[in-house]
């Protein structure tokens, strides 16, 4: 059981952001490779801890090696993987995913997609003697809630179907077999040329669609004829900014609304997945958008998943960046347990389980911890966000530390309340004695009796209320 890998990447400041005269301009102050302090436009500070933070001087190679390489390697070995770039328009999603160009780009600037393609075929060629591989490539765009085949534009409305053994499928989508990275990149370039490009005030060439690159890697073992299939999906999401900020109108406004609807659906699915069982049962609204439906297997756990939160470093975009980072924090709590989709030989299926008692206990413990954290994380996160203590609940150890801290603080304040009450009791006792003495001095036995009855009943009600 592993968490989703969530990283943030701050691109260099644009020339417009550099010209901003109102501030020194930068909203993130690095603490270490995983943690930074974020300052919003009201100068409130939030500390974020993610799996890795890439600042403006980070290289494309570093992002690939940390975020994508392990997922690509597993996909070649039959474990599904998904890599998503998320963030507002102009935050660096496409730069991170593709680089300045897929084919004719210098080595240094190459994005995740061409690196994944090269890495995949390199790994395949180094293990060709133990297995035969078949790689197929598809490429689709989700635009205005329609899935369009970017490798065959006549297929403008691909249907999404579900199959018990293969999971989510794009019915009739073009799947081109590719035998090396040059061929794969050529097809990707064809697909990219077909991508719908809209215009908004914020970025004259911003893409207004989600784009998914899908690789199916089938491995036929030379030795025992076992077949493993790994699906690797890379998704470059459309920009997540608010429609009103773009100043868009007409069709562009409709595009922005549709994009926001599908990104909200993605947020809702993540919320449902990370909120634990609810009164409504655990309904996960995958069907609310094409995007969440296509990502259903990835989000539902049968896939390794990495999310790159692309951010502007500028205070001008602080509110969008804050919501991007909060989205990332939320996604971090999705639990994934990807399995290799291996078709076993009959002999392998008969083999007795070699799982030890300790391993079973470990698994049960993990499940218990998982349930506990699912229920507690939301409450804790809300409290800590309110208190300005944004944190990363990476492990149960962290949950326990946080709990211990809260419990000890609660005990301290209860102790203080008990001390105050004891002092109050002492003061009242002294007053009581004084009143009784006064009554005796006045020689009024009847009044003393009434007074003492009054005091005892007041005393009793004080301590039972
Ligand atoms: N890490 C980076 N290093 C250098 N330049 C970058 C980096 N990230 C982004 N840029 C530049 O910033 C600009 C916007 O980036 P990009 O087009 O990737 O944004 P985007 O998030 O994909 O936007 P959209 O939602 O419109 O697709 C581009 O000119 C890009 O070259």
Swiss-Prot record:
It comes from Arabidopsis thaliana. Residues 3-334 form the Kinesin motor domain. Disruption phenotype: Partial seed abortion due to defects in megagametogenesis. Defects in pollen viability. Gene3D superfamilies: Kinesin motor domain. Kinesin-like motor protein that promotes synapsis and is required for proper crossover distribution in meiosis. Plays a role in the nuclear division cycles during megagametogenesis. The keyword Transferase does not apply. This is Kinesin-like protein KIN-1. Residues 341-358 have a biased composition (Basic and acidic residues). One of its GO terms (cellular component) is microtubule. InterPro entries: Kinesin-like_fam, Kinesin_motor_CS, Kinesin_motor_dom, Kinesin_motor_dom_sf, P-loop_NTPase. The gene is KIN1. Belongs to the TRAFAC class myosin-kinesin ATPase superfamily. Kinesin family. KIN-1 subfamily. Transmembrane segments: none annotated. Homodimer. Interacts with WIP1 and WIP2. Keywords: ATP-binding, Coiled coil, Microtubule, Motor protein, Nucleotide-binding. Residues 402-444 form a coiled coil. GO terms for molecular function: ATP binding; microtubule binding; microtubule motor activity; protein homodimerization activity. One of its GO terms (biological process) is pollen development. PANTHER family: CENTROMERE PROTEIN E (PTHR47968), KINESIN-LIKE PROTEIN (PTHR47968:SF17). Specifically expressed in ovules and anthers. The keyword Iron-sulfur does not apply. Residues 338-358 are annotated as: Disordered. SMART domains: KISc. The lineage of its organism: Eukaryota, Viridiplantae, Streptophyta, Embryophyta, Tracheophyta. ATP binds at residues 87-94.
């Amino acid at each position: 059981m592993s968490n989703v890998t969530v990283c943030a990447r701050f691109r260099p400041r644009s020339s417009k952001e550099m010209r901003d005269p109102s501030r020194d301009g930068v909203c993130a102050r690095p603490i270490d490779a995983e943690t930074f302090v974020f300052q919003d436009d009201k100068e409130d500070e939030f500390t974020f801890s993610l799996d890795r933070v890439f600042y403006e001087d980070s290289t494309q190679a570093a992002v690939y090696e940390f975020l994508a390489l392990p997922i690509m390697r597993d996909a070649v070995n039959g474990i599904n993987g998904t890599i998503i770039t998320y963030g507002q328009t102009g935050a660096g999603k496409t730069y991170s995913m593709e680089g300045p160009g897929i084919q004719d780009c210098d080595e240094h600037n190459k994005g995740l997609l061409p690196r994944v393609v090269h890495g995949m075929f390199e790994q395949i060629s180094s293990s060709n003697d133990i297995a035969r591989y078949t790689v197929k490539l598809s490429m689709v765009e989700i635009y205005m809630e329609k899935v369009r085949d970017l490798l065959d534009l006549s297929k403008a409305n691909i249907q999404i179907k579900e199959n018990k053994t293969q999971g989510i499928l794009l019915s009739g989508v073009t799947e081109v077999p590719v035998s090396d990275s040059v061929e794969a990149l050529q097809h990707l370039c064809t697909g990219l040329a077909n991508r719908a490009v809209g215009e908004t005030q914020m970025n004259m060439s911003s893409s207004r669609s989600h784009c998914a690159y899908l690789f199916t890697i089938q491995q036929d073992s030379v030795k025992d004829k076992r077949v493993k299939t790994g699906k690797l999906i890379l998704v470059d999401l459309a920009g997540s900014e608010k429609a009103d900020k773009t100043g868009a109108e007409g069709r562009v406004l409709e595009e922005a609304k549709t994009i926001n609807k599908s990104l909200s659906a993605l947020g809702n699915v993540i919320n449902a997945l990370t909120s634990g069982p609810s009164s409504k049962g655990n309904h996960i609204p995958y069907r609310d958008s094409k995007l969440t439906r296509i990502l259903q297997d990835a989000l539902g756990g049968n896939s390794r998943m990495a999310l790159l939160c692309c951010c502007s470093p500028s205070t001008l975009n602080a509110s969008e960046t804050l919501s991007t980072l909060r989205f990332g924090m939320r996604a971090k709590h999705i639990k994934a347990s990807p399995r290799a989709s291996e078709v076993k030989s009959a002999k392998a299926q008969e083999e007795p389980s070699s799982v030890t008692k300790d391993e079973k206990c470990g698994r049960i413990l993990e499940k218990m911890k998982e349930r506990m954290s699912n229920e507690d994380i939301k409450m804790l996160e809300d409290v800590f966000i309110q208190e300005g203590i944004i944190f990363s609940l990476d492990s149960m150890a962290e949950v326990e530390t946080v709990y211990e801290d809260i419990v000890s603080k609660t005990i301290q304040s209860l102790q203080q309340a008990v001390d105050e009450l004891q002092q109050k009791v002492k003061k009242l006792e002294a007053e009581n004695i004084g009143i009784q003495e006064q009554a005796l001095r006045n020689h009024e036995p009847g009044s003393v009796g009434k007074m003492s009855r009054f005091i005892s009943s007041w005393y009793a009600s004080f301590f039972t209320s």
